Structure formats: structure tokens, C-alpha cells
Amino acid sequence: MCRLLQIIRECGLLEDLQRLPDGDLSWVEPKGDNLSGGQKQRISLARAVFQNASIYLLDDPLSAVDPSGRQKIFNQVITSDKESVVILMFYCSCIFSFMIYH
């Protein structure tokens, strides 16, 4: 599986892409006006992960994502990279319940 497709799946974007009329070639309005807040956050996270950086600074990257999506993305994306430093800032204590075990 290509790396981009893997990141799209891990960030929970595959279903969103499949629903768009032209898939990954669909036009996104400037500033993402035709996307939900959760979609914008998941796209931003996917773009960051695709960069394959050694350090990530993520400011509340899952606040607009639904609760089940938060945990899945946190487990598959944020905690899976053992070689990078990930600095997270959250403003919602609900994140801590599944974060404490990582």
C-alpha cells in the first residue's frame, strides 16, 4: 500500500474522499470552506504526518473530530511513530482518558 493511502486511512479520510464527486481530485475551497472542522483537522494532520518530520508540534489536533475518531487517530497516527518527537497540546480533558496509557 502506498504511504499516502496509508496516511489517508489512518487519519480517517478515506470515506471522505470516496464521498467527494472527484475523489482526491475534488476541489477544496480556499480555507477549506466546504469542509467540516473535523475534516480540516484530519487533513492538516495527514499533511503533517506525510512530511515525515523528526519533531511535530500539534495544537489540539483532534478537537473537532468525533470521539471515536479521536481515539482511533490518536492510536494509529500520533502514537505509532516511535522515531519522532510529538509535542501535543489539548484543551479538552476527554483526550487524557486514552492518552494516559501511551
Segments the model singles out, each with a brief description of its role:
Residues 56-60:
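Catalytic Walker B motif of ABC-type/P-loop ATPase nucleotide-binding domains
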Residues 1-27, 52-54, 69:
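Conserved "ABC signature" C-loop
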Residues 45, 73:
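Hydrophobic anchor residue at the start of the ABC signature
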Residues 6, 40, 76-77:
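Short coil/turn segments at secondary-structure boundaries
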